[in-house]
Amino acid sequence: MLLSQTAASRMRRRGRGAILNVSSVASGTAMGTYAAHKTWVEIFSCALAEELRGSGVQVMALKPGTTDTGFFSKITTKIEDVPTIARLTPEYVVEQALNDLARGKVISVPSVIYKVMDFLTWKAPRSLVCRFTGYLQRDRFRV
């Protein structure tokens, strides 16, 4: 938050710039602290984008899905356990994020499969989302 606000202040004075905060398609799910933090990042980014509207500074929250990075070496789930269709490469995520930033989007969700998941996460009843994601993650994503 402090980095984004400091950067925003300097960029606003210059009249241009972009801030990209990394959220996750896991925001809004029952994945505990991780999901809560990623939801906060998304809401913060939306609020900051609104504050900076018309200043020449763009703000975007990137909500990638499963991306083949070092993240999976720190949790019990392995990247190989994720269906191939749901795995994203870092290069693809960056390309999609930059395209969305160029289009002025405030939220970027790379990949159709994750766009659908994100839509359902926020439109389905909270109790259903929490129960379903809690069930799926019961023995996974433990540090």
Regions found by a protein language model. Give the residues of each.
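Active-site "substrate specificity/gating" loop of NAD(P)-dependent dehydrogenases
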Residues: 3, 28-32
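A short helix-coil junction within the Rossmann-fold of NAD(P)-dependent oxidoreductases
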Residues: 6-15
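The catalytic Tyr-X3-Lys active-site helix of short-chain dehydrogenase/reductase
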Residues: 32-40, 44
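SDR active-site lid
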Residues: 49-114, 123, 127
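Residue(s) in the substrate-gating loop at a strand-loop-helix junction
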Residues: 24
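A short, exposed helix-loop element centered on a Lys and neighboring polar residues
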Residues: 4-5, 46
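Short linear elements at protein peripheries
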Residues: 133-143
